[in-house]
């Protein structure tokens, strides 16, 4: 019997249901060409992309001091990693190591006969990696094998932590759980190499002789281990509802930031937060001894949806940055954002200082559901956010409007330290699960892409015979400015048609024109190769607004200033 939470809650990583993954939103089938939106400044460009198949997803990514990169996730048989093929069960945990040029060095797969998942990875400077996730152990053979270690489960799902050395050998593996479902969602390392794991548990759970009991359906756990796997302390937080941690990060001072979701009233040591609606996002800070320093919350008053915090990052000044999604009007410490669609969710991005005071709050979205799943932050406070954007009319990131692609797609958005969006890129149909930022202007994005051919990451194309994981290295490059057209003019206006023309942009590959009735929110889009487009099927005696973007060879400009025209009666 599957635990109840698999049908009621959407967690950051995919949960395995039956013989397939259940995503928070189904991935689109078709994959489309990259469109990049920026002001012609520094933009991340794909250097290499690797795919991991078949039937899986890559959930976590990290790197070591030598510039090697590690990715974990879930995969089914056969486990294909470039030239390496590893036999798998229905759903196993994998860890791969690549050098900085994308050459695979090794791959390791572990698990049992049922549906196991790798959710996150952290790597120390020596190249030791710590993978967390879950193993399903409610079948006739409730075991999972990682290297020479055989783990026996306690219930439906146990949470998992495995240490690998730099050569891919399993150093130790541990699992913990209750009679119900327990999942490890995130892992991070402090400057001393101690390991922090977070996730959620139910009922009574014992970790290295320490037993804790949830107050509600699920509670948050935070565990600290030394590098040898010895438990140093175990903390819990929550209340009478479903309380789940999705992400974790350690700052340079050894403090821990966590993000997730809660219902009703949740208690973190001496601090409590109360949800405004069905469920809110939380961000909590702990010191290295496990003391809760503060907790903040944000969300809407809607009674039909939870507003989860999905990922967290930190800069060199120890500020925290979070992302997630929300419905309705969501308030975070006095700042509010309004959902742009009539249904579904929008993305939020927020920055908090070391004392827990919010510094800024931004949102992005369109009429369909849009999700923020991952965030990466550099030392100076630039942040990159990814997840997926919904199909339908275009998604708006502050001043940047994206044209509709007709399918859900991966996006990558950059914000400067003040929260000003710098650019947004659109990629293949799928979801961006994790971001790891380096200090050399590069970052890694991993996730899952849909079955099909022509999966484009900038000019790199992949072909998937089944849904599969990917990892992509991006580095900042200076691109030539792609400017919007000027001289937008409406002419030959009738009761149902109008011609929109503009001054041609040198080197343009084409143009994208958006138009809508004045006072409405939904844009319609027409593309053209010439500096002219004819709009048809307009309503008589109606005012319209229009804007035009330039399609360049490698990116798309912002839209021009809006022009207004009125059809004849």
Task: Name each model-derived stretch.
Residues 40-480:
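A sequence-level/structural motif corresponding to short, flexible coil/turn segments enriched
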Residues 480-507, 540, 555-569:
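Pro/Thr/Ser/Gly-rich low-complexity, intrinsically disordered linker/stalk tracts
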Residues 529-534:
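Short S/T/G- and acidic-enriched coil/turn segments that sit immediately N-terminal to beta-strands
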Residues 28-38:
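Bacterial N-terminal signal peptides
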Residues 507-525:
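Extracellular low-complexity, O-glycosylation-prone stalks/linkers
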Residues 1-23:
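N-terminal secretory signal peptides that target proteins for export/translocation
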């Amino acid at each position: 019997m599957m635990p109840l939470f698999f049908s009621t809650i959407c967690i950051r990583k995919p949960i395995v249901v039956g013989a397939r993954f259940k995503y928070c939103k189904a991935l689109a089938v078709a994959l489309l060409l990259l469109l990049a939106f920026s002001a012609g400044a520094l933009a991340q460009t794909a250097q290499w992309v690797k795919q991991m198949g078949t039937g899986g997803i890559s959930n976590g990514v990290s790197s070591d001091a030598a510039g090697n990169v590690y990715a974990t996730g879930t995969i089914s048989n056969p486990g294909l990693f470039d030239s390496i093929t590893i036999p798998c069960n229905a759903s196993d945990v994998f860890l791969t190591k690549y050098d900085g040029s994308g050459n695979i060095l090794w791959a390791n797969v572990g698990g049992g006969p049922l549906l196991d998942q790798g959710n996150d990875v952290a790597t120390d400077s020596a190249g030791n990696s710590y993978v967390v996730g879950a193993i399903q152990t409610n079948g006739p053979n409730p075991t999972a094998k990682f290297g020479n270690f055989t783990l026996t489960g306690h219930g439906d799902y146990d949470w998992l932590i495995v240490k690998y050395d730099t050569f891919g050998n399993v150093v130790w593996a541990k699992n913990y759980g209750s009679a119900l479902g327990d999942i490890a969602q995130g892992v991070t390392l402090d400057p001393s190499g101690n390991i922090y794991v977070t996730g959620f548990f139910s009922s009574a759970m014992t970790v290295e002789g320490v037993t804790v009991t949830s107050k509600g359906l699920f509670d948050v756990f935070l565990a600290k281990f030394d590098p040898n796997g010895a438990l140093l302390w175990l903390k819990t937080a929550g209340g009478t509802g479903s309380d789940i941690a999705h992400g974790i990060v350690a700052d340079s001072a050894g403090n821990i930031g966590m993000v997730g979701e809660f219902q009703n009233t949740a208690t973190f040591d001496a601090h409590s937060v109360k949800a405004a609606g069905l469920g809110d996002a939380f961000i909590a800070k702990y010191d290295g001894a496990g003391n809760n320093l503060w907790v903040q919350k944000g969300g809407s008053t809607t009674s039909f949806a939870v507003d989860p915090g999905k990922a967290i990052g930190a800069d060199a000044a120890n500020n925290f940055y979070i992302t997630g999604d929300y419905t309705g009007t969501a308030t975070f410490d006095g700042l509010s954002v309004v959902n742009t669609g009539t249904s579904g969710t929008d993305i939020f991005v927020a920055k908090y200082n070391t004392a827990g005071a919010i510094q800024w709050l931004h949102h992005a979205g369109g009429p369909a559901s849009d999700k923020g799943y991952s965030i990466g932050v550099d030392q100076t406070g630039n942040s990159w956010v990814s997840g997926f954007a919904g199909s339908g009319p275009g998604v708006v990131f502050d001043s940047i409007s994206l044209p509709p692609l007709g399918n859900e797609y991966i996006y990558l958005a950059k914000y400067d330290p003040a929260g000003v969006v710098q650019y947004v890129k659109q990629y293949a149909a799928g979801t961006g699960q994790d971001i790891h930022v380096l200090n050399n202007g590069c970052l890694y994005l991993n996730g899952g892409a849909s079955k099909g051919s022509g999966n484009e990451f900038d000019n790199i194309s992949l072909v998937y015979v089944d849904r599969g994981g990917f990892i992509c290295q991006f580095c900042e490059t200076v691109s030539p400015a792609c400017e919007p057209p000027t001289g937008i003019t409406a002419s030959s206006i009738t009761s149902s048609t109008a011609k929109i023309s503009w001054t041609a942009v040198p080197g343009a590959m084409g143009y994208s024109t958006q138009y809508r009735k004045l006072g409405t929110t939904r844009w319609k889009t027409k593309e053209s190769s010439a500096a002219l487009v004819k709009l048809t099927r307009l309503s008589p005696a109606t005012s319209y607004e229009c804007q035009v973007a330039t399609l360049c060879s490698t990116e798309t400009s912002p839209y021009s200033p809006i022009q207004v025209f009125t059809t004849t009666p």
